[in-house]
Every structure is written in C-alpha cells, then in structure tokens.
Design a protein with these regions (language model features):
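Residues within the DNA-recognition helix of helix-turn-helix
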Residues: 53-56
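Hydrophobic positions on the alpha-helical face of helix-turn-helix-like DNA-binding modules
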Residues: 25, 38-40, 50
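Short amphipathic alpha helix immediately N-terminal
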Residues: 20-32
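Short amphipathic alpha-helical boundary/capping segments
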Residues: 9-18
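Short, basic, alpha-helical segments at the C-terminal edge of helix-turn-helix-like DNA-binding modules
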Residues: 66-72
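C-terminal flanking helix
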Residues: 58-65
Length: 72
C-alpha cells in the first residue's frame, strides 16, 4: 500500500489519539495534499515545525497500529 494512502487510513482510525496540532497538520498534508510551506502559512508555524509534527504523527500512528492492529 502506498505510504500516503496508508497514513490517510491510519488517520481515520487513530487520528483522534493524536494531539490537535498533529491531527490538523497530518490531515492537511495527507488528505488535503498541501505542501509543508502551505501548511506552515495556514498554521502560522515554521516549515520545520510542520515537518516535525508530521513525522511525530506518523510515528504515533505506526505505534498505535502495531499495538492495536485495527487496520491490518
């Protein structure tokens, strides 16, 4: 499964377990297909902050899936 599709599905299952900012940024990146720069401007945070938030969300979603296994 393509990474973007997989993360999008994981967001549907586990998104509410992320922080509000992680969820917002991840949804904009994976579901709305916005760039890091566009998200940074919308969220009023640095581009690097957007990237870090996405990476933390990806890690958290992966951890939740490995423990709960609802998607697989």
């Amino acid at each position: 499964m393509a990474k973007n599709l997989e993360i999008s599905i994981l967001l549907d299952y586990y998104g509410q377990m992320l922080t509000e900012k992680q969820l917002e940024v991840a949804q904009l990146y994976y579901n709305e297909d916005l760039s890091l720069a566009e998200i940074a401007q919308l969220a009023n945070i640095a581009r690097q902050g957007v990237r870090d938030s996405i990476k933390r969300a990806e890690h958290a979603l992966g951890e939740m899936e490995s423990k709960l296994g609802l998607v697989a």
